[in-house]
Swiss-Prot record:
It comes from the Archaea. This is Uncharacterized protein MJ0687. It comes from Methanocaldococcus jannaschii (strain ATCC 43067 / DSM 2661 / JAL-1 / JCM 10045 / NBRC 100440) (Methanococcus jannaschii). PANTHER family: SPORULATION PROTEIN YDCC (PTHR37507:SF2). It holds the Pfam family LolA_like. Gene3D superfamilies: Lipoprotein localisation LolA/LolB/LppX (2.50.20.10). The lineage of its organism: Archaea, Methanobacteriati, Methanobacteriota, Methanomada group, Methanococci. InterPro entries: DUF4367 (IPR025377), LolA/LolB/LppX (IPR029046), Put_LolA-like (IPR033399), Sporulation_related (IPR052944). SUPFAM superfamilies: Prokaryotic lipoproteins and lipoprotein localization factors (SSF89392).
Amino acid sequence: MNYKYLILSLFLIVGVFFAGCTQQMNADEIAKKMQEKYEAMKSMEADVLITTNIMGQTETMQYKYAFEKPNKFYMENDDVLIVCDGKTYYMYDKKKNQYTKMEIKGELNNMFNPDYGKFIKSMLEKFNVSYLGEKTYDGRKCYVLELISKENPEEKMKMYVDEEYWQPLKIEMDGVTIEYKNVKFNVDVPDDRFKFVPPEGAKLMSSGAMTTSKNIDEVQKDVSFKILVPKYTAGLELQNAMATKQNANNEESETVILTYGENGELAIIESKDNKPLTIPENGSNLITLKNGVKALISDSGDVKMLMFEYNGIKVIIAGKLDKNELIKIANSMIE
């Protein structure tokens, strides 16, 4: 099972509720309408088909999917089962008969029930939205929209938006197509759909706990290391802080993820385990931060990444920012 694409698909499915409608509506009106419809929606079931084409390789993943507000979800196909009942998250590898378990506490609603009106407005302000007409997709009437990035006209997206519930049923973008088929809104999803009972002989590979909050001080309580909080964030505000503690093969690890910007423009990942980060002595990607701290930086593509280790904490800074901005952020974390 390809876990890279599995995690990608999970985030795409949970986080794809943004869209708009008619040509005459502005970003504020679209955001308000979408927020109203999302708040009225209590649950959803669908078959989700995700097709990726990366470097000429096409991969298709299909899942049974269910979501119930505020924080229950279910995904399943022939390879994997992922469920969360709002308190515990499980990922089960069917072929290997192995599973991981994560206890969840804190403001989980921030992850699965965010302020979509604010998110949608921000997205639409960065795209030019064209209304292409109406089409029927999978038996449901849809508005068809084309979104073209104001910064990069090559970045395009086409959406088929359900007329009744204002949710996207098909999203086409560069290299990825997401389709929701057999969609049912506001259905009664059985509680046992979100629960997991390990099959006979299933092996627990790792267990841990996850805490989420909009307050870094709250997640600080659940990790043993001092979180490196950036003093400079390129004007982006903290949206979510998440701490995880895991035990796999009798090895413990702790990770903190800080997300900044309404659209997640900046992510800072800090981790502590028994494996030090290896920084080469030289190379074109090697830079020196404040106080002689060595770091690696990758500035190819839209997403830039910077990695370094400080006080035993491995740090990855990633975002759609200029590399000089990433360096300023990193230096603001070093005392």
